Amino acid sequence: MASGRTGRGGRFSPGVTANRLRVRVAALLRGSWRLAWAAGQVGLLLAILQAYTVLRRTFFQQPAGEAFANALDLIRWQGALGLNVELDLQRWALRHDWLIDLVNGYYRNFKPALYLCAVLACLFAPAGYRLVRRAFVAVTLLALPWYALFPLAPPRFMAPYGYPFVDTLNALSTTPNATSGFTAANQYAAMPSMHMGWTSIAALWLAVALPRWRLGALLGLLHLAMMAFVVMTTGNHYVFDILGGLLLAAIAIAIAWWLPDRLPWTAAWNRILGWLARRPGLAGLRPAPVLDGSPARRAAERAAERAA
């Protein structure tokens, strides 16, 4: 028996089935393309973070004496404002083994969480992902000079100076952590806290990826608040470091918002995507539109995504 569907008037129309099949195949190809693009974006983020690590270690390492002097000054400044809460917070957490295990794991896995948030934004809100990606690049670049201008020893190194913090990632964890202990790269880069800076970016990706009922925004705020608790409890950052990371993220978001619509490499990249979209088997794929900070452009991007 021939297979097919009926068209208008109940007449058999094999073309209807063929057309629907083509639509489904095109949708599948678009989905596969987006998954591949998301994987490529994770690779890009990995490369940026690796370059950041190398630059921070190579060009922005400062003498330990200056870093400890700055830490003592910062503790005094915080004390004058009643903000030296890190040691009391850690002492409370140390009474609960399960909580220490939780914060150690949360701290250690913050980069995988960043990549996951990026993938969600790539899949569900690619235009929003691109805008926030600009902020990610900006906050990463803005952080580097601060490590040379204001090297800062983290709380976990301050026990010899009368502040008996515990390095929980080394002392109370079975898994070694490259970011903890004197063997890691540039140990005097506590200010600003890039755990907070990059977690702010992750929170924005969640917000654009899951807008319904503001679920993404709520999850992002929860993630950000948890990270603030974690970096203090593990002895890695002071309150001022947290505020510095948040301030730097806010500046980066403002830069991303006001950047021009088309950056120098945008046109060339879109030509490549346009060429790929015209290849056989990739029909229906289009270059992703560029997003600037204007509300009109954002509305146009959302309309284009709904129509895709």
Task: Pin down the residues of each PLM region.
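N-terminal transmembrane-helix/juxtamembrane module of multi-pass inner/ER membrane proteins
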Residues: 4-113, 280, 285-287
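Alpha-helical transmembrane segments of integral membrane proteins
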Residues: 41-44, 102-105, 109-112, 131-138, ...
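Alpha-helical transmembrane spans of integral membrane proteins, capturing the lipid-embedded, hydrophobic core
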Residues: 41-50, 136, 140, 144, ...
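Aromatic-anchored segments of alpha-helical transmembrane domains
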Residues: 50, 140-149, 222-233
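Membrane-interface loops
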Residues: 56, 63-72, 123-216, 260-297, ...
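Hydrophobic alpha-helical transmembrane segments
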Residues: 105-120, 195-203
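Interfacial helix-loop-helix junctions of multi-pass membrane proteins
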Residues: 154-158, 190, 226-252
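Hydrophobic alpha-helical segments of polytopic membrane proteins
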Residues: 214-218, 228, 247-263
